[in-house]
Amino acid sequence: MWTVSYAQNTSMTLDNLPEQLQKNLEAAGLADLTVDQCEIIRRFLAGERTLVSGHDGAGKLTALVIGFAAKALASRRSLETGRLPEGLLITNHPEDAIVAAALFERLTHGSGLKAAGVSIGRNVPRMREIE
């Protein structure tokens, strides 16, 4: 698990992201990322299973969605052969699922990719009852 630190006064950029994503990040006002966000994205793109913990507003969700968008946009060959990029982002709050799906579509604008937001947060107690 990667724990997001509270020292977020420095920012950096990721130059190795697909060009379309970099343009869409700038258009969305997300060109300057925190060091922690860059580390989350780096680990995600390296293929590490990424579980992130941190305070509200730390940018965890944004970083993970950027990672998903980067992988999806870099998978052009897969898209051309009809294979969809794989990924699953589980949230505890329905609002986060909606925000993640909307941000993904904004960051992949022009690619034709779509996202669906799914949250299991409110269903967990019901699932435990069924067991």
Residue ranges with predicted function:
Residues 2, 6-53:
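Conserved pre-motif I regulatory segment
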Residues 19, 23, 38, 42, ...:
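Solvent-exposed alpha-helical segments within well-ordered globular domains of core cellular machineries
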Residues 34, 62, 97-98:
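Loop/helix-junction capping segments adjacent to catalytic residues or to phosphate/diphosphate-binding pockets
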Residues 28-31, 47, 71-75, 107-114:
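Conserved, well-folded catalytic cores of nucleic-acid-processing
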Residues 52-68, 86-87:
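Glycine-rich P-loop/Walker A and Walker A-like loops and their local beta1-loop-alpha1 context
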Residues 41-47, 60-81:
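Walker A/P-loop NTP-binding motif
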Residues 34, 52-53, 76-81, 116-118:
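Active-site phosphate-binding and catalytic loops of NTP-dependent enzymes
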Residues 82-131:
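Conserved nucleic-acid-binding Ia/Ib motif block in the N-terminal RecA-like helicase ATPase lobe
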